[in-house]
Amino acid sequence: FENGQAYENMCYHDVAPAVALPAPGTVVLRFFAPDATCVEVAGIGGGMGNTHHVMKRSTEEDGWWEITLHDIPEGFHYHEYFVDGNRCLNPHAPIGYGCFRPINYFEMPGEDSSFYYLNDVPHGDIRMEQYRSPVTGRIKACWVYTPPGYDYAHTESYPVLYLQHGVGENETGWIW
């Protein structure tokens, strides 16, 4: 604060989305880098390929860079940004964990993708539990899903599924 007023950069500003899906198979990606001389985006395999696509500086001179990509197949797409040759996360776009690191992603919906939409049906709960590992002695985390209507005080038994994510990601990949 300066003289009782918040600094301008501490205020929320309306920002256009960094990922937009204006039509099937089309994605618009935006990155804020006002001092950059070059911004690129590349997919991690999949429909975007590994090609570096050079983004164009916004004509509004507002620090944003943008690119529109077409023919992107439906599904989940990891991608990464390069600002003046340096790999960077886009803080304005969704960030997940894959390829052994935090990484940006987007999901291109398709005709058969309605199964993962938030539908109007009963939902269970997901909680993170912490425990001390008897092997390492360290605090670890696990995620517990309980079905709709589950009551911790109830004596009814429920089946258990133990699910461990494989190489390159972690357990959050199953719940986000």
Describe the residue ranges of each PLM region.
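Short, flexible loop/turn elements at secondary-structure junctions
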Residues: D35, R132-V135, P148, G166-G168
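Short, hydrophobic/aromatic-rich segments at coil-to-beta transitions
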Residues: W64, V121-E129
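Aromatic-rich carbohydrate-binding modules that target alpha-glucans
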Residues: A20-P22, V28-E74, D84-E111, T146
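Short substrate-entry loop that stabilizes the transition state in hydrolases
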Residues: Y150-W176
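A short loop-to-beta-strand scaffold at the N-terminal edge of the catalytic core in hydrolase folds
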Residues: T136-A153
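Hydrophobic loop/turn residues within beta-sheet-rich immunoglobulin-like superfamily modules
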Residues: H70-I72, P134, T155
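Non-catalytic, glycine-rich low-complexity segments
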Residues: F1-A33, P109-D120
